[in-house]
Amino acid sequence: MSSLDDLIARAKLLLSEGHSPGQIADELSLSMETVTWLLTQANGGSAAPKDVHIDWTAVSSQAPLLDGIALMLLNRYYGAQKDPAAASADVIVGIALSGIPLATVISVQEAAQLAIYHPAKQNASEHPVGSISGNFAPVAKERCIIVDDVITSGNTMREVVKYLKKHGAVPVAIWVIFDKRGIRDIDGVPVYSLFKISRID
């Protein structure tokens, strides 16, 4: 079985287990367009969308390695600041699902509060909206750093930034491990990634 066949099978398995296409996109670190294609693909169909699959489970499943990634993100961010003390945040916002463990580790290292954002794409309602979980820190009037594993299209990050600003928060930075788009900032909020992923055709 090819890696493409594996992805098609995995996407269909996740769908059969009740995952929404948005959750599948997060699980596989792929765009919604690619997931839609995987779920509707019959042999010999249309060409696959241009995307890059990232499997970082060797790190994400090991807490000590995840801690090391968090430390690299901290060093990457503070190393780029002219005044590191002024660059700190009150709240670390983890984007569900993959951003949550990373944000948790970072919030411990930063002695910051932890907030969790549920993107609209994970909401199965007819008119999906994203939201901050009421079980974690509030974001109003707080300086926030947004954390996730991958920027695929940038749509989720735009959604989070818009949500935070609308609710009176001040997003100061976006931290990701992998950036598939090479985005410098999202609506004025700078992006700090460890790795930029480029597809060369």
UniProtKB/Swiss-Prot annotation:
Pfam families: Pribosyltran (PF00156). GO terms for biological process: pyrimidine nucleobase biosynthetic process; regulation of gene expression; UMP biosynthetic process. Disulfide bonds: none annotated. GO terms for molecular function: DNA binding; orotate phosphoribosyltransferase activity. Keywords: DNA-binding, Transcription, Transcription regulation. Contains an N-terminal DNA-binding winged helix-turn-helix domain and a C-terminal regulatory domain (or effector binding domain) resembling phosphoribosyltransferase (PRT) domain. Belongs to the purine/pyrimidine phosphoribosyltransferase family. GfcR subfamily. NCBIfam families: PRK02277.1. This is Transcriptional regulator GfcR. It comes from Methanoregula boonei (strain DSM 21154 / JCM 14090 / 6A8). The gene is gfcR.
